[in-house]
Amino acid sequence: MGDSVSVLHPKVLLVSAGFTTSLFVGFNLYRRYCRRIRTYLDLTPSILDNQRQLYGKVTRVGDGDNFRFYHTPGGIFLGWGWLRKVPETRSALKDETLMIRLCGVDAPERSHWGKPAQPFSEEALQWLRNYVMGRYVTITPYSIDQYKRVVARAQVWKWTGRKDVSAEMIRTGIGVVYESKVGAEFGDNESWYRSLQNRAKLLRRGVWSLGKKMTTPGQFKKTYYRGE
């Protein structure tokens, strides 16, 4: 009995404190870096306010300025791509992805709900598919819009470095700077996006090749009483 150690012994208290601290730190590290963001409901105000970046794979491109994103926290370091696979079927991906609405850019409207298609709408869709479909991208979520889409900046690695997807759309003229004041998000890039648009317009790239016949997506949606 003489060798027994009280639970109040300094060494016991120190070990207990260290163990508790390790659990607390580990839990917070898991929540911040390892927990999957499955849907927009998992995006906490802290994530949006701090503009925390998320890494994942583009699983579907359904329009010229949005896509489905499967979050893969930790990337290759946590086994994604070799130990852990991203689902491929629509049923397996149900309720497991974020719908991303690219920030700061508006693509020409495709034909739906009885509305005619804008020129370059299919080109914009094909461009985005070629640029990001099946690739891993980094998103910076800014907000959630009225359609439950995550308005975000998206960046993807290319041979020439990391590219801002919105900027590249504007640069090539298959997207224009977002015009609506409702839900507009640019991060810190609005002036950059506008300078890229001015150059695309000067060089008559993409939609700007239409000259006076060109109607922006924002103007087009106003004509058909549908705002986004």
Swiss-Prot record:
Q: What is its EC number?
A: 3.1.-.-
Record membrane topology: Single-pass membrane protein
Listed A to Z, the keywords are: Calcium, Endonuclease, Hydrolase, Membrane, Metal-binding, Mitochondrion, Nuclease, Transmembrane, Transmembrane helix
Lineage: superkingdom? Eukaryota
Ranges annotated as spanning the membrane: 13-30
Q: Which SMART domains match?
A: SNc
UniProt cross-references to InterPro entries, sorted A to Z: SNase_OB-fold_sf, Staphylococal_nuclease_OB-fold
Indicate the segments forming the TNase-like domain, all copies.
52-210
Q: What residues sit in the active site?
A: R101, E109, R149
Mind telling me which PROSITE patterns this protein's record contains? TNASE_3 (PS50830)
Compartments (UniProt record)? Mitochondrion; Membrane
Can you provide one Gene Ontology molecular function annotated for this UniProt record?
Answer: endonuclease activity
The entry marks the following residues as binding Ca(2+), namely D106
Main EC class of this protein?
Answer: hydrolase
The record's Pfam families line, in alphabetical order, gives: SNase (PF00565)
Q: Name one GO cellular component term.
A: membrane
UniProt lists the family membership as follows: Belongs to the LCL3 family.
Task: Indicate what this protein is called per its UniProt record.
Answer: Probable endonuclease LCL3
Recorded source organism is Meyerozyma guilliermondii (strain ATCC 6260 / CBS 566 / DSM 6381 / JCM 1539 / NBRC 10279 / NRRL Y-324) (Yeast)
Designated gene of the protein: LCL3
